[in-house]
């Protein structure tokens, strides 16, 4: 089968590889779509941080690996001990493999497992391939009528939703989202469906601001002046930093009220600047969030019900255009691209 194999920074090859077969407790999928994630772009263009160069302690995987963790696919086969899935059933994948034995797994906090592995990074075969094999516990069946493109969006939107859950945001609080990419949009959606006010989404790209406006967001260009000034001098209770950029973190510290909360929802490409003295002076709480923990079902329901609007910012490409998709997203063009590995 054809797959996108990561050999190192700047070296992703479309190769013919053996088709995987499921072992006990595993399910084989025919991949319909796999989304390109910002994490993939970091690995491809910047540095090899999440893909191991030595055998992973849980999976034994190391580079070269097949990329891809934002997966929608249909069930093809199942290994011994797997029940509850039908051939051809559309599912989405929660791509965290966990040990089930450490302190965090025993309390259900699988996203901080001591030996956590991410499918498509620290496992042998990810979703940028015609077929992939995953543990049955990672699968979420989709409701009737959900499309494969919608199902492939569940992972990235669950990342955003976990940040909203971790923040404890509630109606009556003022929030702002810094960064209008997929995680920023998902954060806005997650806040809105909980009745929390999003005073603005901050985004420097005119094209992305146009999409956000179509989605009903109040949009701010950070180049037009201090955020507080653009908000008529009013600070916010909670800031969601989803751009993972040093300038954006600086803006987050300034726009948040004293004793407010700054949520770090995205992983930075470069170290954040030493501006935390402002957090000290304002007694800010800075809280990080990683992946997800129980958000998939709610996100799937929100997508299926039409609460989350996807049509205006999600596009599809064939696998033959994978490198063009990498370059386009790296340049800040487009928002979310889903890859069809079959073409």
Where are these regions (language model features)?
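Glycine-rich cofactor phosphate-binding loops and adjacent beta1-alpha1 units
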Residues: 167, 171, 194, 210-285
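C-terminal hydrophobic helical "lid"/dimerization subdomain
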Residues: 250, 293-343
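NAD(P)H dinucleotide-binding glycine-rich loop of Rossmann-like/cofactor-binding domains
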Residues: 57-69, 97-178
